[in-house]
């Protein structure tokens, strides 16, 4: 089958975006993997699918598939590319759209400066809802947050557990470039205490309003940037009393700005950052 696609990226986190709004797109996990393959396909961290919503009061449905073929709940950098895509394709002329994701809805706004502002929703810190198994563990309070000990290859790492619609484990490190992210990331991702696996975040505090971040993503490995990972890290840092909003997040792919008023109940995190169209094309996929 032949399939038209658009290649996009948000701070280096790259995507294959498909229009399933004006035409049916039903891909198998094997076809998703073929599209995302960097040697034999287009190459991407995730595949993004635009569809008609299945609930009332929203404009589009936003689905995300990791390069391993599995569908996931959320992708913040992809959300910025999503709104740029639907506007460029003429599917909407609105600057702000409401989008259905796997666990609720989010609002995406194209700003005058070309960056996209994403309402990322409210972070969840309840371990059961992340989910994270705490049986037999004793947490440690730091500020308004609870840190949990995690055995990583025989070393105890103290982590914050956060859900941004998808699960995150965030730890503070001294030097994010020197830290063994590629060694510890996959161990944390598949740790038995995370029944749905987890995105592993490694955060270096630069100042009260600035961090450096690397994320080993569930099902994708380390990516150049992770929007939900940036939000989870900032939320954890603010709760721990280490950061003040807004926070500039430096990733290998570029910078994101995260804002959050943690003093207001149910207040969402806001993420601002770039969305770039790289090229469009057509590919022959195996049936």
Swiss-Prot record:
EC number: 5.1.1.7
Subcellular location: Cytoplasm
Listed InterPro entries: DAP_epimerase_AS, DAP_epimerase_DapF
Enzyme class: isomerase
Record keyword Ribosomal protein present: no
GO molecular function: diaminopimelate epimerase activity
Site (Could be important to modulate the pK values of the two catalytic cysteine residues): 168, 217
Record-level GO cellular component terms: cytosol
Active site: 75, 226
Gene Ontology biological process: lysine biosynthetic process via diaminopimelate
Binding site for substrate: 13, 46, 66, 76-77, 166, 199, 217-218, 227-228
Name of a matching Pfam family: DAP_epimerase
Catalytic reaction(s) noted: (2S,6S)-2,6-diaminopimelate = meso-2,6-diaminopimelate
Pathway per the UniProt entry: Amino-acid biosynthesis; L-lysine biosynthesis via DAP pathway; DL-2,6-diaminopimelate from LL-2,6-diaminopimelate: step 1/1
Superkingdom classification of source: Bacteria
Record key words, sorted: Amino-acid biosynthesis, Cytoplasm, Isomerase, Lysine biosynthesis
Stated role: Catalyzes the stereoinversion of LL-2,6-diaminopimelate (L,L-DAP) to meso-diaminopimelate (meso-DAP), a precursor of L-lysine and an essential component of the bacterial peptidoglycan.
PANTHER family with a match to the protein in the record: DIAMINOPIMELATE EPIMERASE, DIAMINOPIMELATE EPIMERASE, CHLOROPLASTIC
Family classification: Belongs to the diaminopimelate epimerase family.
Assembly information from the UniProt record: Homodimer.
Protein's UniProt name: Diaminopimelate epimerase
Organism listed in the record: Paraburkholderia xenovorans (strain LB400)
